[in-house]
Amino acid sequence: RDFCLSRGLGDVYKRQAQTILLYAAFGSEADLSALAEKAQAQGKTLAYPVCGEAYSLTAAVPGPDGWEMGQYGIRTPILSRSEILLPEALDLVLVPCTAFDADCFRVGMGKGYYDRYLPRCKNAVKIGIAFEAQRVEHAAVDEHDQRLDAYVTERGIYKWK
């Protein structure tokens, strides 16, 4: 499903983001391909996650022919044909979820890839991308789950206070 960006994400994106980690939508996740096209046209660096061993995540900037169907059937950059970015190089991280709450906690797919990776993104604004229907009263989180800076849905932006 294509995702219409709210003004809130647009403001963060325009001001702060030169190097962005986003994702190739899988299943019912919000599709960010329109944002990716616009960002690429503006000369921004776009990286995508690659799932690795021991539930690790790598940010990879794919080359022109640098895509494959990766683990879990997700469109993924081919590491050997990509530029690898350190987490500290990212300005903005856009994170998918299956559910989120007003405190900006997220529920992912259960493997913890993002929860292990996000603390290393010390310079990045971390924003969850979701549909309003995914908002819950209290997300079922564990001690390792990471709080995001904000969430953007088709209706607006939720910021953690």
Write out the residue ranges for each language-model feature.
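Short glycine-rich anion-binding loops that position phosphate/pyrophosphate groups of nucleotides
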Residues: 26-28, 98-102
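Charged helix-capping and loop-helix junction motifs
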Residues: 108-114
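Phosphate/pyrophosphate-binding loops at sites that engage ATP/ADP/AMP, CoA/4′-phosphopantetheine
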Residues: 11-15, 81-87
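Extended, well-folded interaction surfaces typified by the phenylalanyl-tRNA synthetase beta subunit core
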Residues: 19-84, 132-138
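A general structural motif
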Residues: 17-19, 43, 90, 123
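Surface-exposed, charge/polar-rich loops and edge strands
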Residues: 78, 88-93, 101-105, 116-161
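Single conserved hydrophobic/aromatic residue that forms the stacking wall/gate
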Residues: 2-13
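Residue-level signal for inorganic ion chemistry
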Residues: 22, 46, 94, 110, ...
